């Protein structure tokens, strides 16, 4: 599936920090979505890191924090700083350092910005970066990224009730797949994911409150009508 055989040999990299990973994702995204302002200034890059939409998790970082993270990325040659402008501007160098084609960069970028995604979600969310013909082509590039000597992505265990597996990037280090195994690791179909359990607890509380409200309403109406609702009914 690799359509660019002349790519350089990938380099071994250390684990990135979450902010370093976010910066790389923002640089690739803005390269495609706002090319007129790319390479990005520090201000624009910080705004992209703190963006509320299309980000998971949402961050709130300062320009000083972004500057420190940029220094680390420049040391890895993943980011380059331009010198043709009075305002420092930054661009990514992921294709050459990682040795992967633009299609794979697009998928990796979405994972860096949005967290775990299914192949279908990746195809949809990467449309502005690269148009994949079908889900199979997305999966082919993901499989290549996962099969590298230093894997860049991993297929997560299917979540309970989910129809598809999700994928996650490994730029920030390996993940414990057991944390994502859900009912498969819990040993039974009765296991409930934490989010669903919290939703069930909230629904139970709502129902309890509703029953209490209705009981109070019945008691008030009975008092107004002179009816003793606690009295036993006729035995026959």
Curated annotation (Swiss-Prot):
It comes from the Bacteria. It holds the Pfam family DUF480. Signal peptide: none annotated. Transmembrane segments: none annotated. InterPro entries: DUF480 (IPR007432), WH-like_DNA-bd_sf (IPR036388), WH_DNA-bd_sf (IPR036390). Gene3D superfamilies: Winged helix-like DNA-binding domain superfamily/Winged helix DNA-binding domain. Coiled coil: none annotated. Belongs to the UPF0502 family. This is UPF0502 protein Bcep1808_3727. It comes from Burkholderia vietnamiensis (strain G4 / LMG 22486) (Burkholderia cepacia (strain R1808)).
């Amino acid at each position: 599936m690799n359509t660019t055989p002349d790519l350089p040999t990938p380099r071994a990299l250390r684990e990135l920090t979450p902010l370093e990973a976010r910066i790389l994702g923002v640089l690739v995204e803005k390269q495609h979505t706002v090319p007129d302002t790319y390479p990005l200034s520090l201000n624009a890059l910080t705004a992209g890191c703190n963006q509320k939409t299309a980000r998971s998790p949402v961050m709130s970082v300062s320009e000083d924090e972004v500057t420190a993270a940029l220094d680390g990325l420049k040391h890895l040659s993943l980011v380059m700083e331009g010198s043709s402008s009075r305002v420092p501007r930054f661009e990514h160098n992921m294709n050459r350092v990682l040795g992967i084609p633009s299609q794979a960069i697009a998928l990796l970028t979405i994972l860096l910005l949005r967290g775990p995604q299914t192949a279908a979600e990746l195809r949809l969310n990467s449309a502005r970066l690269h148009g994949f013909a079908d889900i199979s082509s997305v999966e082919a590039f993901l499989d290549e990224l996962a099969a590298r000597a230093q894997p860049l992505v991993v297929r997560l265990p299917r979540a309970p009730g989910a129809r598809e597996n999700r994928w996650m990037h490994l730029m920030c280090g390996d993940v414990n797949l057991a944390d994502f195994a859900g009912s498969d690791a819990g040993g039974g179909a009765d296991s409930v994911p934490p989010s669903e359990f919290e939703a069930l607890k909230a629904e139970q509380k709502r129902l309890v409150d509703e029953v209490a409200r209705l009981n109070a309403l019945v008691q008030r109406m009975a008092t107004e009508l002179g009816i003793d609702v606690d009295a036993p009914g006729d035995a026959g």
